[in-house]
Amino acid sequence: MSSVKRRKTEKNTSSGLKSKQAKEPKEASPLSSPEPTEENQNNEIEEGTEEEEVTKSFKDLGIVDSLCEACDTLGYKAPTPIQRESIPLALQGRDLIGLAETGSGKTAAFALPILQSLLDKPQPLFGLVLAPTRELAYQISQSFEALGSIIRVKCAVIVGGMDMVPQAIALGKKPHIIVATPGRLLDHLENTKGFSLRSLKYLVMDEADRLLDLDFGPILDKILKVLPRERRTYLFSATISSKVESLQRASLKDPLRVSISSNKYQTVSTLIQNYIFIPLVHKDTYLIYLLNEFAGQSAIIFTRTVNETQRIAILLRTLGFGAIPLHGQLSQSSRLGALNKFRAGSREILVATDVAARGLDIPSVDVVLNYDMPQDSKTYIHRVGRTARAGKSGHAISFVTQYDVEIWMRIEAALGKKQEEYQTVKDEVMVFKPRVEEAQRHARNEMKNLHEDRGKKGAVLKGRRPANGAKRGRDEMDREEG
């Protein structure tokens, strides 16, 4: 099948499609920033806003020269607001609750103080970071190793879905930092001979609200019981909830709270947000139209189900787009491979379930397309947070069908502002319809073959009972739904 993907050359005029310059979309006004709030005088609260002075360097915050050099090497020109507010407090030895939007630099905000303390008093098993997903755990470890390269920090990633024996060997080598998903860490605490965290100095719970959304609460309780009381604890999250408040009371001592966004559903000011109201039957056609509008830019397309992720990836590849799927039913190596290809630019479109919506380090995403609407405002915030990161601009467009109007109205209400519609010309969109329909037929056949292959494999395994059911359950919890 011939490609419908617009390429930025004169050959577009012979493709059979109407050739035109991608017009500038009608921009929605960026969400207004919250008014600066006065610092709460309560000893437990330390508020910050993005209006504060931005000229401070990492050295001004108290970071030592060797770590400042690492920041410079990684291209960290100046601290982000969450880093400016939290690092000095962490260096004072306080427990912290850090609240800031996705993409604000939370990882360096807790990694730098831990590495500086490790530099002063080096010891094995110094810090533990708990993360909700395997991908996020790997990325946090990479950040620690990059920032701590000068001091040769050693990290171990302990996550579900991987062989426990190599992990036990890695723990036996006494790394400085462990980054783990809760279920697999508890497996090792209970079953790996000689492994304990009695000497731990730092605990970080990253994406704490997501940890609790995935029902890790009981496992976290068990982990907290075996950790030393004399430790520093940092809890970082994009949003706050009653569950997070309960976790804070159970695990932190007299914490200071750093909050960069006073609005629970705040998005960054460099993000353009639009919606497009379309009939359900034409979603694929509008998707191809938009991808041509944003030709040459990287994009994440969010879907609700694994099947839809697979189908759209096949559809796009059939039409000549470099698309790759990411969802929770892929093997760990396949998921990491998909992310690496997308980061490297060998694939420009990532089609993903919400497994990709939280914490993933993909700094160059230009466009987020909500092909399927998220079911709540919090998920929407984390999806669109994949673009407009670290001060860059970005664009998010949500597909609103006749069945999504109520959800979209709730999201707009939570954001506190109505979004503008992305302007399209129906005749220009429908030019793509014949080729899209042909690609849809091909995708349906491919999906049918895929399901038949899976059915055959399932028949072979039918009736087998997995050994060690409890351990398997924890591994399943370590995997993101979808």
From Swiss-Prot:
Membrane-spanning ranges: none
Domain spans labelled Helicase ATP-binding: 87-258
Intervals of motif Q motif: 56-84
PROSITE patterns noted in UniProt: DEAD_ATP_HELICASE (PS00039), HELICASE_ATP_BIND_1 (PS51192), HELICASE_CTER (PS51194), Q_MOTIF (PS51195)
Pfam family membership, one: DEAD
Bias (Acidic residues) ranges: 44-53
Position of sequence motif DEAD box: 206-209
Recorded GO MF terms: ATP binding; ATP hydrolysis activity; RNA binding; RNA helicase activity
Quaternary structure annotation from Swiss-Prot or TrEMBL: Interacts with the SSU processome.
UniProt free text on domains: The Q motif is unique to and characteristic of the DEAD box family of RNA helicases and controls ATP binding and hydrolysis.
Protein name in UniProt: ATP-dependent rRNA helicase rrp3
Organism in which the protein naturally occurs: Sclerotinia sclerotiorum (strain ATCC 18683 / 1980 / Ss-1)
Annotated gene: rrp3
